[in-house]
Amino acid sequence: MQLNGSQIFVEVLCEQGVDTLFGYPGGAVLNLYDELYKNADRITHVLTAHEQGASHAADGYARATGRTGVVLATSGPGATNLVTGIATAYMDSVPMVAFTGNVATEGLGKDGFQEAYIEGITMPITKHNFTVRRVEDLADTMRAAFRIAQSGRKGPVLVDIPKDVTAAVCEFTPKKPEPIRTVTTFNEEQVKWAAEIINGAQRPLVYFGGGVRSAASCQPLRDLLKKAEIPAAYTLMAAGVVPYGDPMNIGMVGMHGCYTSNRAVADCDVLIAVGARFSDRVALNPKTFAKNATIIQIDIDASELGKNVDVDLAIVGDAAYVLNAMLPMIEDKKHPDWIKMIHEWQAQDYHPVSDASRLMPHQVIGEVCNQCGPEAVYVTDVGQHQMWAAQYIRHTKSRGFITSGGLGTMGFGYGAAIGAQMALGRDQRVVMFTGDGSFHMNLNEACTAVSYELPIITVIFNNQVLGMVRQWQTAFYGKRFSQTDPHRKTNFVKLAEGFGLKGYHCENLAQFQEAFADALKRKGPTWIECMIDKDEKVLPMIPGGGDINDIIMK
């Protein structure tokens, strides 16, 4: 059948199972938006306040579901406003397809109104990108974009569509989506060798990251820990993969991880890294990281093997397939002395002391968990509040904690929470933690939450400073607080009212308990401002370049 480019655009989106699209209209994409208007019963379009918010929403949608997030923006500034969101998804291996409009093909490279070479700009931060110069290529290019985003190590793909392509006509043939290409092969001899090393270990430790978030990978990982009684430490991106309360879960590892997990890394004799890339927030000193251990690394991306830390055995493959193949070779073995040592270290873990005279982050987060129960989805911005949330939330779901890890994007949270809420439905409880610094970055997305009546509860830790940077200035810069005391006078309650949502101001735990209970009853979005001390710190902390011997506990 004969269709124009805009009709093909919608048909392929539906063909790929897209039910929700985040975006912002403009001149170069008017034809696409006209077709979306005609197909509003097939695809829900979410209009955000800013294209960056749309990109974070597509990201949050993908993280919450595992499906591909989709974002659409116009040419020029619309396209460049997506860059931070695309880079955020790229660093955390999130499947996303970003569609951008552009000037007509004959005008490409001539510096026309709102032209930007978005293909070149995004080349380092996408798995692949395309510029579609003929309408005949549009359908298959879109299909390729979705396939690439989900294949192997997941990530964002960009498709740039000149305006004339959206109006041109060609023959269109519908196709069924191709199966996602999964890496099912691996070196069986290496897996046997890995099993032998693990079976011979006296102090084994699993260190796992965001690469095991998929349901297929989570279960074999849990089975391995249980069968061989192996303690496990996780990265920020893997919170919830092994539930809170599992006896083998010894906590988050890295710069703001717990003492036990960091001590275990230093003292283990075999380290099994699964879906983790040894980032500089975990392997702060690559030369001393797990220096006493034989290191086995399992990763779907061959380029990550041995990239940051030298490893003894590198296995390329999908964690689910590798672990399932390894499990029958693993002996049912106990490590009583090692587990006893772990328990002794756990007695030394940092636990903040509550102070009834002021509101403290761990109390707030604990109360949120108490009132929400285990099924809530938690989203964060970036800063001290992000680390507090990672430390104190009782994580139980593999996709229940959504945060920007690799890029560390302040302003990520509200858009991501909107995406998660749209993906999971209004009956799913979504709570977003932010700080006054991060929240100022993209709080304009409040109008989106209000417009779509999304019951997102936003908890704002307001210490009236840029807390994480200030903490570093306290520790390493002689308390020279350069530009981290902004002296802002934002009244978040009045600002909330201006957006059309309910705001609360809390200075003690009783006020917060009452405010959060009330927010849970409301159908729309709410903000709860929590006043905390500007000198509140994220602890423990290992300075950059340090190791367990440099850990700061007070």
Report the location of each language-model feature:
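Active-site diphosphate/adenylate-binding microenvironment
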Residues: 6-10, 14-19, 27, 32-37, ...
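N-terminal alpha/beta PP-like core and its mobile active-site loop of ThDP/TPP-dependent enzymes
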Residues: 1-333, 367, 371-374, 429, ...
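Charged, low-complexity, helix-prone segments enriched in Lys/Glu/Asp/Gln
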Residues: 61, 80, 334-354, 420, ...
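Active-site nucleophile and cofactor-binding loops and adjacent substrate-binding regions
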Residues: 24-26, 45-56, 71-78, 133-134, ...
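Thiamine diphosphate
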Residues: 99, 108-114, 306-308, 314-316, ...
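Well-ordered beta-strand positions enriched in small/hydrophobic/aromatic, beta-favoring residues
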Residues: 69-71, 159, 378, 401, ...
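Phosphate/pyrophosphate-binding active-site segments
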Residues: 136, 174, 196, 292-384, ...
